[in-house]
Design a protein with these regions (language model features):
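Short, Lys/Arg- and Gly-enriched loop/turn segments at beta-strand edges
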Residues: 72-86
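Short, charged/polar micro-motifs that form catalytic or ligand-binding hotspots
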Residues: 52-55, 207-215, 267-272
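Long, contiguous, compositionally biased segments that the model treats as domain-scale units
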Residues: 1-64, 69-73
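Interdomain/boundary linker segments immediately adjacent to catalytic/signaling cores
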Residues: 129-215, 219-220
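Eukaryotic short linear interaction motifs
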Residues: 74-76, 91-94, 277, 301
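Compact, glycine/acidic-enriched structural inserts
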Residues: 85-127
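Catalytic core segments in nucleotide and nucleic-acid processing enzymes
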Residues: 222, 226, 232-345
Length: 345
């Protein structure tokens, strides 16, 4: 249907949901190509998922989802789509082990063998504009080194920490993909002498991607806190039960000081996505009754949000993502800038 021979071409698809017990339905894929016909814009949609579809259940807001389209062997329109909507973090982890971090709101598309082949390097276009340090050709740099190098490539026209964070994550991720390509692509092109060699490399790539996904956001926040005058904090400080919250304010010493005012303590947990994962932070700092959670999650359902709030979790979300949340809760979301201002004011 990706053509302009007619206005708004469409095709009907048999939609089967493998992850949930619901009946098959006839969905409709349509290409609104009105711009070609003198109107405002073009966009593509899939509609008519049917009642009871997990794709339309608000409780699945933010869930990682796979859509597998069965291509017509003769080159005609696709007639079938198989759907998996992740219902748990365990399911999401299985997928991200194969393809690396899936950034909230991102669309990764292409032939199945490239996306889920175990060593997908093309989940995002690699930007070759960066001239990498020579010694990075011989060794894979640490996350801190990549962020330090990326600092000279950040957009300079904003002093808003919310905007800065998203820009810096984008630049740092571009550089990470370039370094990964530098170290892995030639090995893949040469092929493998055994299945064990392939598995070893696939595991190495997967582990590095997971490590980067887990630390990148924390490192960016640490740099931004310091730049914006928030210098009194501890990372990975030990609390009750040997727990290690991502950030404690103003310090680990203050947290353990029985005479320090409890109302002046803050804890910030960091999760790229918070659907279900938010429960992991509830007992990381027993003295702090309302904990803060920074996330890039693009929306949660009203029920999920109420459960977080009732459990003493306050969401900190970049300002540009607030519109992704239900209108009823937007006023209660904190921006990163507001969080920093509260602790530096």
């Amino acid at each position: 249907i990706n053509h302009t021979r007619e206005l708004n071409p469409s095709v009907f698809l048999n939609a089967h949901v493998s992850s949930h017990d619901c009946p098959d339905n006839e969905a409709r894929a349509i290409y609104y190509n009105s711009r070609h016909f003198g109107k405002t814009r073009n966009e593509k949609r899939i509609t008519r998922w049917g009642r009871g579809s997990p794709l339309q259940n608000p409780e699945n807001t933010g869930a990682l989802t796979l859509l597998a389209f069965k291509l017509d062997e003769q080159g005609g329109d696709c007639k079938e789509v198989n759907i998996w909507v992740c219902a748990s973090t365990d399911e999401e982890d299985v997928i991200e082990t194969a393809i690396g971090e899936v950034i909230p709101g991102a669309l990764i598309s292409g032939p199945a063998g490239q996306i889920l082949g175990g060593l997908s390097l093309q989940q995002a276009p690699v930007n070759h504009k960066y001239i990498l340090p020579e010694d990075w050709h011989l060794r894979f740099p640490s996350g801190s080194e990549i962020i330090q190098y990326a600092a000279s490539h950040y957009v300079k026209n904003s002093l808003d920490p919310d905007e800065q964070l998203l820009d810096r994550r984008r630049v740092e991720y571009d550089i990470f993909l370039l370094v990964e390509e530098l170290h892995v692509l030639d090995i893949i092109r040469k092929g493998f002498g055994s299945v064990d060699e392939f598995i070893a490399l696939a595991n190495s790539v997967s582990n590095r991607r997971k490590s980067r996904a887990g630390k990148s956001l924390e490192l960016h926040l640490e740099h931004l806190f310091i730049e914006h005058g928030l210098r009194h904090f501890a990372t990975q400080a030990i609390t009750e039960g040997n727990k290690k919250p991502d950030f404690l304010f103003p310090s680990a010493g203050a947290y353990h000081d029985t005479e320090f005012p409890v109302e002046n303590l803050r804890m910030l947990a960091v999760k790229t996505t918070c659907k279900d994962r938010w429960r992991q932070i509830l007992n990381e700092a027993d003295k702090i009754h309302q904990v803060h959670l920074f996330t890039l999650q693009e929306g949660v359902s009203l029920a999920q949000y109420r459960e977080m709030r009732e459990s003493g979790v306050r969401l900190v979300v970049p300002s540009s993502l607030h519109k992704k949340y239900p209108e009823a809760v937007r006023a209660e979301l904190m921006t990163l800038g507001a969080f920093i201002a509260e602790l530096t004011g």
